[in-house]
Each structure stands twice: as C-alpha cells, then as structure tokens.
C-alpha cells in the first residue's frame, strides 16, 4: 500500500512539472505588462511625467534605458492579440491595426544608477506585442505610421 502511494505521488509530482503554465501565471505576465507599459489617463506627458512614472512603476533600480507607456483603453490593447485590433507581425508578434497614444521615456545620461533622468517623447504609434493565451505579455516596439 505504501509503495503504491509513493509511486502515485512521484508520478503526480512529475506531472506537475510538465504541465503548461496556468491561467494565473498568464494573468501574472499580463499584469506585469500593464504595470510596465499601461497608463490609461496620464497627467502630463513630459520629462517630469516619465521620471515620476518610471519611479512609481519600479523601473529605476537600475535605471531602465527606455520604456513606453500606452494610454487609452486596455481592452483595445488586449484586442491586438486577436483579429479585432491586431495582425501578425514577424515571428510570434502582433501589430495593432490602430495607433495608440504613447509616451516613450528615454534615459538621459550614461549612468544606470538613480537618480534617473528621462526625456519624454509623446505621439501616436502602432504597437507591436507578444501575446500568450490572447493576452499581451511583452511590448516589442512602437512604430510611427504616417
């Protein structure tokens, strides 16, 4: 009996290691994406905005070289991962069909140690994301399309 139970537990534990990521893990990666790249209603979109947002989002220890914040509706961002607002782009990426209002924060100076100083560039861009289970999990780039 003990031998059978031990074998069952061994097989069960091995099975856990081979299962695909759970929905909770996928949602965690999506939440990380939102934390790094989403700000629905920005208060200003200047250098001070970048310095404040980068600090509040935990992207300044060390100073991140570049980060883009996407503004607007999160449903439209999620829709890039489907046909509603996205098209295939390269290998395993999707590009938005419509442009988004974005603010890109570029690190000024060469040091990656705080205090971090950023230069803001605001505009409308199509965005390229990697998706997992129909959720954006990585912002690859933003593209200006005239």
Curated annotation (Swiss-Prot):
Residues 1-24 form the signal peptide. InterPro entries: RNaseA (IPR001427), RNaseA-like_dom_sf (IPR036816), RNaseA_AS (IPR023411), RNaseA_domain (IPR023412). It is an enzyme of class 3 (hydrolase). A motif (Nucleolar localization signal) lies at residues 55-59. The modification Pyrrolidone carboxylic acid is found at residue 25. Gene3D superfamilies: Ribonuclease A-like domain (3.10.130.10). Its main location: secreted. GO terms for biological process: actin filament polymerization; angiogenesis; antibacterial humoral response; antimicrobial humoral immune response mediated by antimicrobial peptide; defense response to Gram-positive bacterium; hematopoietic stem cell proliferation; innate immune response; negative regulation of apoptotic process. GO terms for cellular component: angiogenin-PRI complex; basement membrane; cytoplasm; cytoplasmic stress granule; endocytic vesicle; extracellular space; nucleolus; nucleus. Its EC number is 3.1.27.-. Has weak tRNA ribonuclease activity by itself due to partial autoinhibition by its C-terminus, which folds into a short alpha-helix that partially occludes the substrate-binding site. In absence of stress, the ribonuclease activity is inhibited by RNH1 in the cytoplasm. In response to stress, dissociates from RNH1 in the cytoplasm and associates with cytoplasmic ribosomes with vacant A-sites: ribosomes directly activate the tRNA ribonuclease activity of ANG by refolding the C-terminal alpha-helix. In response to stress, the angiogenic activity of ANG is inhibited by RNH1 in the nucleus. SUPFAM superfamilies: RNase A-like. It is found in: Secreted; Nucleus; Nucleus, Nucleolus; Cytoplasm, Stress granule. Disulfide bonds join 50-105, 63-116, 81-131. PROSITE patterns: RNASE_PANCREATIC (PS00127). Belongs to the pancreatic ribonuclease family. Homodimer. Interacts with RNH1; inhibiting ANG ribonuclease activity. Interacts with PCNA. This is Angiogenin. It comes from Rhinopithecus bieti (Black snub-nosed monkey). The lineage of its organism: Eukaryota, Metazoa, Chordata, Craniata, Vertebrata. The gene is ANG.
């Amino acid at each position: 009996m003990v031998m059978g139970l031990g074998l069952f537990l061994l097989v069960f534990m091995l099975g856990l290691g081979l299962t695909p990521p759970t929905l909770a893990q996928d949602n965690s990666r999506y939440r990380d994406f939102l934390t790094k790249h989403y700000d629905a209603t920005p208060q200003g979109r200047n250098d001070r905005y970048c310095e404040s947002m980068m600090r509040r989002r935990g992207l300044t220890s060390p100073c991140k070289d570049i980060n883009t914040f996407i503004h607007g509706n999160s449903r439209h961002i999620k829709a890039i991962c489907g046909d509603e607002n996205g098209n295939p782009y390269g290998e395993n990426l999707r590009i938005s069909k419509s442009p988004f209002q974005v603010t890109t924060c570029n690190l000024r100076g060469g040091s990656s140690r705080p205090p971090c100083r950023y230069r803001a560039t605001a505009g409308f861009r199509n965005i390229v994301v990697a998706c997992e289970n129909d959720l954006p999990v990585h912002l690859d780039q933003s593209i200006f399309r005239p």
